[in-house]
From Swiss-Prot:
Catalyzes the reversible reaction in which hydroxymethyl group from 5,10-methylenetetrahydrofolate is transferred onto alpha-ketoisovalerate to form ketopantoate. It comes from Photorhabdus laumondii subsp. laumondii (strain DSM 15139 / CIP 105565 / TT01). Mg(2+) binds at D45, D84, E114. One of its GO terms (biological process) is pantothenate biosynthetic process. Its main location: cytoplasm. Belongs to the PanB family. It is an enzyme of class 2 (transferase). One of its GO terms (molecular function) is 3-methyl-2-oxobutanoate hydroxymethyltransferase activity. It is found in: Cytoplasm. Gene3D superfamilies: Phosphoenolpyruvate-binding domains. This is 3-methyl-2-oxobutanoate hydroxymethyltransferase. Its cofactor is Mg(2+).
Amino acid sequence: MKPMTMTDLNQLKKEKRKFATITAYDASFAHLFAEQGIDVMLVGDSLGMTVQGADTTIPVTVEDIVYHTRCVRAGTPYTFIIADMPFMSYATPEQSCENAAKLMRAGANMVKLEGGSWLYDTINMLTERSVPVCAHLGLTPQSVHILGGYKVQGRDEVSANQLIKDAITLEKAGIQLLVLECVPVDLAKRITDELQIPVIGIGAGNVTDGQVLVMHDTLGITVSPPKFVKNFLEEAGNIRDAIRLYKEQVESGIYPGKEHSFY
């Protein structure tokens, strides 16, 4: 089996073929997801809430992400793995390099950082040192206390223009992927069309190049799930078919539908 690479993901964008991504935290589920054709997985700091039972992602440590990245890599040798850099793990350039190296050694293909234009120097430094970077804009869960909760971002002209500016700036800094969370569909389309790199949406409509969901959300485990979530297990009947259905509906553009999107 051929490993998934950024070259492949860039080609998918060029061909306007959508791809599905899912969070993974252990070897067993990672193997199951790979069997269903999921080629990109995110070891997300969402594990703080889904696995550890915290109210936010803030308590998650680098060591937590390292541990779960190793577990996921053990379950799927060919998958493209993105590992979250958790809260305050990239506050300084030195810290960023040290922690990114830990995640790459654990089996990640790329690290993900939350934040806008202020990350330019950090991203530039990491990419110059051969660390592929994914940025995360829109609703950034590590900033939940500053944002005042989990709210849709970019609804007014000023904030929308800032997100567009941030996306362009971060692409110039060297990011190779962008996650765009909880923004209106029209803004997601503007950013996706503007950038040369693939954009992965979550709560951003079906106009992005790819989609990502927390695995617990796809399987209907989450209590009071967000609007953009669909319970694929309810329709499919078993976990394997649920993941396959998620992948198929993302690739065909069926999911997310209007009922899962913000306008």
